[in-house]
Amino acid sequence: MLINDYHVHSEFSGDSQESLDKIFKRAIDLGMKDIAITDHLEYDIVGMTDRWKLDLDRYTKTILEYKEKYKDQIDVKLGVEVGIQPHTREHLENEVKKYPFDFVINSTHALDRHDIAMGELQKHMNKEQLQRHYFETVLKNVQSYNEFNVYGHIDFITRYGGEKYRGLNYKENLDLIDEILKTLINKHKGIEINTSGFRYKEDRFYPCTDLVKRYFELGGEIITIGSDAHINEYIGMDFDVAYDFLKSIGVNYICSFEKMQPVFKKIK
C-alpha cells in the first residue's frame, strides 16, 4: 500500500501544467493518506529566474483551499521545493519563513547561477570536476541553510549532461558526502528517496543506495519518498522499489510532515 508522496509538482511550477484536482484524485485512487505539493521556488539563475518565480501568496492560499476541499479524502500538505545556492540563503529563507509550510525540500539545481540542466556547466568541467564542485556546493548549502526538512535528490548532478556524466563517483566524493550527511543529521534534517531516476533512464533512484545506507549508518533517521512527478501519472511510481530497499536495510518506516515536524509511518 502506498503511504504518501512528498515530492509533487503542479501548474504552479514553471515546468509543470498539471492541475491540482488531477493530482489529488490520482493520489486518492492510489490509496495514499497524505501528499505534499512541493512546487519550485528558485532565485537568481542566469536567464531563468522568471521561469522559476513562485507567487507564494497565491500558491499558499490555493493549496490551503484544496486542503479543505479534500480533507475527508486525503491530507494535503503545503510544501515547497527550494532550489538553493550559497549566495541566495538570506533571500530564500526569509521568504520561506513568511508562510505556514508543513514541509520544505532544499535542492541544488544550479551551480554558480547556472542551471545544471542547461548544459553550460558541462562545457567547462568534466564529470569528475563537476561532481566535486557540486558536492562542495551542497556542503556549503547544508551548512548555512536551516529552514528545510529534507535535502532533495542529493546526487542529482548525474541526471544531466549525457552518458559521459552519468553514474555517481561515490567513493571519490565520500569525504564530502559524509560531511553533508553528518551536517544534515546534526541539524535533525533528512534526505529523500526520489524515484524519478528510473524515468530519467538511470535505472535507480536518487540518491544511490550506497548514499542512503551511509545516511543511516551515520545515525540518520528522517527519510521521505517522492516521485518528483510533474504529471499525475507519475505519482507514486516505483515506490515499491523504494519500500523494498528500505526494508532490506532494516528501515521499516518513512516520514510524513505536519507543521515542519516529522511523523514516522510504518511501511507495511
Language model region names:
Residues M1-S10, L20, D112, K164-K268:
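Charged catalytic cores and adjacent phosphate/nucleic-acid-binding surfaces used
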Residues E81, F156, E258-Q261:
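Residues that form or immediately flank small-molecule/cofactor binding pockets and catalytic motifs
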Residues I35-I37, V104, Y151, I191, ...:
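Hydrophobic residues within beta-strands of alpha/beta enzymes
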Residues D55-E68, D75-K77, N94-Y99, K127-V150, ...:
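Histidine/acidic residue-rich metal-binding segments in metalloenzymes
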Residues Q17, E42-D44, Y99, F103-L184, ...:
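Divalent metal-binding pocket/active-site signature
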Residues Y6, T38, V80, G152-I154, ...:
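Active-site flanking residues adjacent to catalytic metal/cofactor-binding acidic residues
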Residues M1-E136, Y234:
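A metal-dependent hydrolase metal-coordination microenvironment
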Residues I84-P86, M118, H153-F156, P207, ...:
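Generic structural "secondary-structure junction" signal
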